[in-house]
A protein has these predicted regions:
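Polar helix-capping/helix-linker motif
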Residues: 2-5, 160-163, 180
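Active-site-flanking alpha-helical
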Residues: 38, 128-129, 167
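Acidic/histidine-enriched, glycine/proline-rich intrinsically disordered or flexible terminal extensions
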Residues: 170-193
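GST-like fold's C-terminal all-alpha helical module
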Residues: 56-159
Length: 193
């Protein structure tokens, strides 16, 4: 990040960055990384409409992360700020719930965009919500109440062996940290976590 732009594997301001040494390719920005991984790992849907919807889910997840971290800590959480934000968080959750409903998602079965196997939209959904709900019980309760099918999908996908292994590695490397620093401390304070 501190290197001159001319020496960076790809021009970027900050993480995340993905370097695919096999392909001699680097890319920054979460949505671009997800698109690259989805394409190279053959996890993107077959139709243009479902690929576009997948990228909408990816960008929505990125927006939720920006909002829950108050744009990376431009401000800190207060009880009032959290109370004002909670209806918006519920609306975000309802977007996932309605998307899943429109594609046949049920509490015990199905995937966010339909189909017979999980795709990028499911992995991003599970990663977003499980990372948050594993650390903040109040957010978990809101998700369960507001978007029960999304909560169930999140658990099913997060329990897949590869994602469970990744979550265990993250727990080992980072403990119960969510976003770190003062912003996480303020979030934990307002949520009593």
């Amino acid at each position: 990040m501190n290197a001159p732009v001319s020496r960076m594997p790809v021009p970027f301001m900050g993480p995340p960055i993905l370097v695919d040494k096999k392909a001699n390719f680097a890319i920054a920005e979460m949505p671009a990384i997800i698109l690259y991984l989805g394409e190279t790992l053959d996890l993107m849907p077959a139709t243009a409409a479902l690929r576009a919807t997948t990228m909408k889910i990816v960008n929505d997840a990125n927006d939720v992360i920006d909002e829950i971290t108050l744009d990376g800590g431009r401000a800190m959480w207060t009880k009032k700020r959290w109370q004002d934000f909670t209806p918006r968080l519920k609306k975000w959750m309802s977007l996932w719930e309605e998307t899943g409903r429109r594609h046949g998602l049920k509490t015990a079965s199905g995937f966010l965009l339909g189909g017979g196997t999980p795709g990028i939209a499911d992995v991003v959904t599970a990663t977003l919500w499980s990372t948050m709900t594993d650390r903040f019980q109040k957010i978990e309760a809101i998700l369960e109440e507001t978007a029960p099918m999304t909560a169930a999908l999140t658990r099913r996908i997060a329990d897949l062996p590869t994602l469970a292994k990744l979550a265990a590695k993250a727990q080992q490397d980072y403990g119960n940290a969510y976003c770190g620093g003062q912003i996480e401390a303020s979030l934990r304070r307002v949520l009593g976590a």
